[in-house]
Amino acid sequence: MDRIIGIDLGTTNSCVSILENGNVKVIENAEGTRTTPSIIAYANDGEILVGQSAKRQAVTNPHNTLYAVKRLIGRKFEEDVVQKDIQMVPYKIVKADNGDAWVEVNGQKMAPPQISAEILKKMKKTAEDYLGEAVTEAVITVPAYFNDSQRQATKDAGRIAGLDVKRIINEPTAAALAYGMDKAKGDHTVIVYDLGGGTFDVSVIEIAEVDGEHQFEVLATNGDTFLGGEDFDIRLIDYFVDEFKKESGMNLKGDPLAMQRLKEAAEKAKIELSSSTQTEVNLPYITADATGPKHLVVKISRSKLESLVEDLVQRTIAPCEMALKDAGIDRSKINDVILVGGQTRMPLVQKLVTEFFGKEARKDVNPDEAVAMGAAIQGAVLAGDVKDVLLLDVSPLTLGIETMGGVMTALIEKNTTIPTKKSQVFSTADDNQNAVTIHVLQGERKQAGQNKSLGKFDLAEIPPAPRGVPQIEVTFDIDANGILHVGAKDKATGKQQSIVIKANSGLSEEEIQQMVRDAEVNSEEDRKFEELASARNQGDALVHSTRKMIADAGDKVTAEEKTAVEAALVALEAAIKGDDKAAIEAKVEELSKVSAPIAQKMYAEQAENPEAAAKPAEENGKADDVVDAEFEEVKDHK
């Protein structure tokens, strides 16, 4: 079986991992870092930048630089959280034909799974470069509190990226896997508190030894899919904007370039305040008016930051209480608290978690890498490389259908262990009713309209009968990915209808296939771009070496030879400026051909007069005592 990689597709950063020789390895990307910013940029020349390269140019290209797109995945445009996001991001969030939230770049509408696929492609290539072989299968993580639409959309993103997604696994569960694999035998209960860039999850997980097998059972999960580090950044940005307005009377919110610089400064300040008690944000030439350029200089203390975000941190406590209640466990019975997600590095978050659970969180789990590592372990379990692990996850939200009076009737309660299957018999509401509409819902409210609508389908041709007589059996089947399959059957006729829930949200099969084709075209374009760059580099090197050879040859070169070489050099330099790889290669060959006689002449002369050839080397000998300095790149630790 092929290698199955583990990918943490994060809101702010993403990470890829593999199980190798029994050990989990987090793979460094081409830039040498173990995490990759989940940022995608579309350059004017059509090039797609992903990760650090996209982040670097964000200030000069804010409208076409997309970040935190995971917050939009599987969501409707009209949702309050999406409307709130529209006010905060410099790129354009638009309404798709099916009502979903999409983004628009350079006049082209794109679905969030299509954009997330670019990050997954980067993770896939990172793994392939390390392993030296093609990678086609992956386990991808999602927030535990993701609903069905969001899980389906994540799976679609994997397909568009050319990956067969073997399993969708919840992020806290993955972190528990990474933590629990090497722990001593015996039963213990852990809390995974996962506050990432865009989402918050908390899970109560029991790790037990059953017949020599590590069993990870999720007892309960809760969370908020629109609460994370991005919200903390927004509070800081708002503070900086207000301070600047007080000082200069100018509002920066209408200036996308200024807002992008502020976003980067806010993120940097937030990170610095986790280890320092004060920092200064200094952004020269942030804007200008008739009197000249304006500069933003703001000092901010850790206590000020904490006062700005205290309510956000407090919002994580209610889900913790609910998860403990659903699990039927007192907080005193928790053995370990595991912090996951970059935002948990904030001292205020750590303090609140310690106070709530009555114990310090463990420090031996890397909050940025644990999720990807757990995904890699699950991949190894599915591949058969790890045999002593059993993972029992849960469905995070109640699933049911709309019944008479606009009531939601539950079929599968929240925190039910998955995979699971449940059937229930319903009947008609009117006499001689010949069809029923099955409206599938997800959520905790009794009123159907207050829950998330996952889809509708009809069961028709029911034989005429008084109301309440026909027996319609509705079956809900949740697979190991947490994705729902629904069926309805008329028990009298045996007629049935079923769907995988993605009907009223998400991408159609045709759209996914088109995006897969587009991704393949992009891969081909990337390959061509690399080949063109290689040809240009080869041409540049030849131009440089030929000019040096002509200069060294001096009067040994005839006027005719010099003219021919100069013409070939000019032709090659012109070709290098163009985009035609074949033309560059042809001009390289032409220059090599006309300069070959000169090279042969120089070589023959050196062979006849070795002393003369050695003389320049002797003159340069004095430099041999110079020692090359060794420089080490210092990376910012986040």
UniProtKB/Swiss-Prot annotation:
Q: Which UniProt keywords apply?
A: ATP-binding, Chaperone, Nucleotide-binding, Phosphoprotein, Stress response
What molecular function terms (GO) are annotated for this protein?
ATP binding; ATP-dependent protein folding chaperone; unfolded protein binding
Q: Which InterPro entries match?
A: ATPase_NBD, Chaperone_DnaK, Heat_shock_70_CS, HSP70_C_sf, HSP70_peptide-bd_sf, Hsp_70_fam
Q: Does the keyword Transmembrane helix apply?
A: no
Q: Report the leader peptide range.
A: none
Nucleotide-binding recorded as keyword: yes
- PROSITE patterns this protein is in? HSP70_1, HSP70_2, HSP70_3
State the residue spans of region: Disordered: 605-626
Which CDD domains does the entry link to? ASKHA_NBD_HSP70_DnaK-like (cd10234)
Quote the SUPFAM superfamilies the UniProt record gives. Answer: Actin-like ATPase domain, Heat shock protein 70kD (HSP70), C-terminal subdomain, Heat shock protein 70kD (HSP70), peptide-binding domain
Record's compositionally biased regions (Basic and acidic residues)? 616-625
Q: What induces it?
A: By stress conditions e.g. heat shock.
Bias kind Low complexity: ranges? 605-615
Q: Where is the PTM Phosphothreonine found along the chain?
A: 199
Task: Give the family this protein belongs to, as stated in its UniProt record.
Answer: Belongs to the heat shock protein 70 family.
Role according to the record: Acts as a chaperone.
UniProt-listed NCBIfam families: PRK00290.1, prok_dnaK
The record's listing under PANTHER family reads:
HEAT SHOCK PROTEIN 70KDA
The protein here is known as Chaperone protein DnaK
